From Swiss-Prot:
Pathway: Cofactor biosynthesis; thiamine diphosphate biosynthesis
GO molecular function: 4 iron, 4 sulfur cluster binding; carbon-carbon lyase activity; zinc ion binding
Protein name: Phosphomethylpyrimidine synthase
EC number: 4.1.99.17
Function according to Swiss-Prot or TrEMBL: Catalyzes the synthesis of the hydroxymethylpyrimidine phosphate (HMP-P) moiety of thiamine from aminoimidazole ribotide (AIR) in a radical S-adenosyl-L-methionine (SAM)-dependent reaction.
Enzyme class: lyase
Biological source species: Deinococcus geothermalis (strain DSM 11300 / CIP 105573 / AG-3a)
UniProt KW keywords: 4Fe-4S, Iron, Iron-sulfur, Lyase, Metal-binding, S-adenosyl-L-methionine, Thiamine biosynthesis, Zinc
Length: 609
């Protein structure tokens, strides 16, 4: 048998076309360097007095979740991990460095462990280190300034692109400018979270809350059937390239610990997990054998590695399980079904519910965020908004208050499969029951008839619920219900959900959200084809579809595409109309001048100023 080797994969590190990685520098904390992508535009050609003039167009700044991978100045070596984006952690006296990790992985022989596993940190005894605790003290942390800069992107500088329709925000309080103080207040209130484990220094922080840009999560992870560490690391890089704000490692196969370590050390975005999956592996896949002690040790193991948020299915209570008996599709959450089976086998309350305060103490020591799982979410539109789903939601509201007592940041997971007319009730109930803690939803899928296209059926519901107030959307890929997504599925899912998130930002009236739309629309009207491609969410696909019928370089300057041709292009006709209007207007003024006698100056009638 050959010796295990480090993951080797071909990473997607090329910068986006005609784009430049830039960094916004913090004012309160000069160590803060926020990456943004500047899309350079070509000049507009104008005819003035018979002469052609070039009018420059501003760069368009867009959020950049790709991390150092698209910065050609940074050398990427998976075996060393990413450069630290939060260097201030090393000097934080409230943290203590542990001589060794308290937990050891139980994966057995497998791929080469990460070569340089860092020592872990945790809060010193009596120290309150979470973002929520700092916010309540009135402290603006480096992470808070980081996300404030990231949300604004200095869009006001592109004032000519700033025209925007007013939004309808359904009670959200979105300011004209996101300041560090506004971020602090939202985190203190529990209305926003910044998932940022102290053991994930590679992380570029992001904020999740209804008063901020809608975020997108991409699920990754090995299964017992297929995939490998190499593939999952590449999927992480690929997902963040296309706009995933966070990723979740949902590995259920072998070598869960090693897979997670490689992903964390190379991830520029927050990483979430569902710890019950690894806990189940530790007891041989037998749900009845799970114990609080096994789960607790799994939490600590993953906390020491740097996981930023945990899905914890503490809301699946013994009394709720009979409510699912008449459902069309029963309990579809993996975590929910595992815990339901344990509860019924022992006829005892869910141990995650009974030990919830102890879980809070673990998470607060590392500043890990709760993602309270919806283990009883509907798996078909027939089961939407039923008694089981809302009974669990009520419990999640109760647990949110407990988590906040411990200063632990918390978001709430939501459905699922919900027809469009029932979506708003989900958002309204969640805001009321969970005191406006951020909502994080899987879709929802609005119909069950389209396997292979569920990235579309769910993006419809995702755009709608995000408009109503959902803070983060968990993507769905074309492989949903069919198999483990590959690289192309990840891309399709992320792009579909970036569209949904952006549509919701526009509908809510988020400041600056329309700037990119305005820039692309202007480029389209002026037939600046390369700018149209570069401003698109997926420049490669836009260019490929155009070039499939008009591949010649000359087509990049043509005033038509293959859809309408040169004589039926509505925008070309609009240009002609404008030119005719200008010429006709000048001719009319010339006639008026001649009719007035052709004099440069006319006598002013008496009594006029």
């Amino acid at each position: 048998m050959s010796a295990p080797t480090a993951p080797q994969t071909t990473l997607s590190t090329a910068p986006f076309p005609n784009s430049e990685k830039r960094y916004l520098i913090g004012t309160l904390y000069p160590q803060v360097r926020v990456p943004v992508r500047a899309i350079r535009q070509s000049a507009t050609l104008e005819m003035i007095g018979g002469l052609t003039r070039q009018r420059p167009n501003p760069d368009v700044l867009v959020p950049d979740t790709s991390g150092p991978y698209t910065d050609p100045r940074i050398h990427i070596d998976l075996r060393r991990g990413l450069p630290h984006a939060r260097p201030w952690l090393a000097a934080d006296a409230r943290l203590e460095v542990q001589a060794e990790r308290l937990s050891a992985p139980l994966d057995g022989a497998g791929p080469l462990p990460f070569p340089a596993v860092p020592l872990s940190r945790r809060a010193r005894s009596g120290q309150a280190i979470t973002q929520m605790q700092a916010a309540r003290r009135g402290e603006i942390t480096p992470e808070m300034e980081f996300v404030a800069l990231r949300e604004n992107l200095r869009q006001a500088e592109a004032f000519e692109l700033a025209q925007q329709h007013p939004g309808q925000s359904f009670g959200a309080a979105i300011p004209r400018e996101i300041t560090p103080e506004f971020v602090r207040a939202e985190v203190a209130r529990g209305r926003a979270v910044i998932p940022a484990n102290v053991n994930h220094p590679e992380l570029e922080p992001t904020i999740i809350g209804r008063n901020f840009r809608v975020k997108v999560n991409a699920n990754l992870g090995t299964s017992i059937v297929t995939s490998s560490i190499e593939e999952e690391v590449e999927k992480m890089v690929w997902a963040t390239r296309w706009g995933a704000d966070t990723v979740m490692d949902l590995s259920t196969g072998r070598h869960i610990h090693q897979t997670r370590e490689w992903i964390l050390r190379n991830s520029p975005v927050p990483v979430g997990t569902v710890p019950i999956y690894q806990a189940l592996e530790k007891v041989g896949g037998v749900a009845e054998e799970l114990t609080w002690e096994v789960y607790r040790d799994t939490l600590i193991e993953q906390a020491e590695q740097g996981v930023d948020y945990f899905t914890v299915h503490a809301g699946v209570r013994l009394a709720h399980i009979p409510l699912t008996a008449r459902r069309r599709t029963g309990i579809v959450s993996r975590g929910g079904s595992i815990l339901a089976k344990w509860c019924l086998a022992h006829h005892r309350e869910n141990f995650l519910y009974t030990h919830f305060r102890e879980i809070c103490e673990i998470l607060s020591a590392y500043d890990i965020t709760f993602s309270l799982g919806d283990g009883l979410r509907p798996g078909s539109i027939e089961d939407a908004n039923d008694a089981a789903q809302f009974a669990e939601l009520d419990t999640l509201g109760e647990l949110t208050r407990v988590a906040w007592e411990h200063g632990v940041q918390t978001m709430i997971e939501g459905p699922g499969h919900v027809p469009m007319q029932l979506i708003r009730e989900n958002m309204t109930r969640q805001l009321q029951v969970c005191q406006e803690a951020p909502f994080y939803t899987l879709g929802p899928l609005t119909t069950d008839i389209a396997p292979g296209y569920d990235h579309i059926t769910s993006a419809i519901g995702a755009a709608q619920i995000a408009w109503y107030g959902t803070a983060m959307l968990c993507y769905v890929t074309p492989k949903e219900h069919l198999g483990l997504p590959d690289r192309q599925d990840v891309r399709d899912g992320v792009i579909a959900y970036r569209i949904a998130a952006h549509a919701a930002d526009l509908a809510k009236g988020h400041p600056g959200a329309q700037a990119r739309d305005n820039a692309l629309s202007q480029a389209r009207f002026e037939f600046r084809w390369e700018d149209q491609f570069n401003l698109a969410l997926d420049p490669e696909r836009a260019r490929a579809l155009h070039d499939a019928t008009l591949p010649a370089d000359a087509a990049k300057t043509a005033h038509f595409c293959s859809m309408c041709g040169p004589h039926f292009c509505s925008m070309k006709l609009s240009h002609d109309l404008r030119a005719d209007d200008i010429l006709n207007g000048m001719a009319e003024k010339a006639r008026e001048f001649r009719a007035a006698g052709g004099e440069l100056y006319l006598d002013r009638p008496e009594g006029t100023p």
